[in-house]
Amino acid sequence: VTATIVFDFDGTLAIGHGPVMAYAECAAPLAGAQYLERVETALAEYDAGGGGYRDGYDVVGSLAAADGVEAAALSDAYARSRDVLGTPEAPVSAVEGIDEILESLGRHARLVLATNAPAAGVYRVLDSWGVRERFDAVHFAVGKPAGLTPIIRLALEDGPVLAIGDIFEFDLAPAVALGADTALVGATASTSPESVTMRGQTIAELRPDIEAWAASAASSTPAPEGASPRLER
């Protein structure tokens, strides 16, 4: 049995609004008056559990679209912001103790990074954290939610799977549909009505639960088909 933990990147491993504000800066020349101020206000509301936005990138895109910015222009703004990911123009913060956490989990589970983001800048960030080699596989431009399904399905052939992310619809719903376990982190963790295996503000907060899951999963025997007992913590 080989357990697998599938991590999202933005909002899960990479936290803070630096990359989001870099995206907003690139979109601002095309948007309306006081756009950046409106983005900052909406981000604060999102962080407090309100606003109804999917994540920070949704805040930036939605407000720009409401100002008449076309999808193609927003896509270009996003791409330009990712080119500077991990630089002073788009600073990224890591989950506290990320290297130790990944090192610990890697003793018991295969670690996979699966993100909708393009590769641009991500390896630079992982290298700056010293964790690039902690991952057994890395998938970019996955096309979640649908694109996550084959990754989860393949991992389940080897053993238990835990998907970790900050957007239930994209990062966790495909895992739930296949019977895998899930961990919801980020601003929506405390308010989301979705049923998940565990939830917390950050991976660091959930570290004991995730480590316990990994140790248990690594020593487990395959469950009978259709059996998926799960308790939310």
PLM segments and residue spans:
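An amphipathic alpha-helix signature
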Residues: V20-A28, Y57-G61, A119, Y123
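Structured N-terminal alpha/beta-domain signature
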Residues: E40-G51, V60, L148-A155, L162-G165
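Asp-based, Mg2+/Mn2+-dependent phosphohydrolase catalytic module
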Residues: V1-T2, D99, E103, V112, ...
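A metal-dependent, Asp-based hydrolase signature
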Residues: T41-T87, D99, E103
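Active-site neighborhood of HAD-like aspartate-dependent phosphohydrolases
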Residues: V1-T41
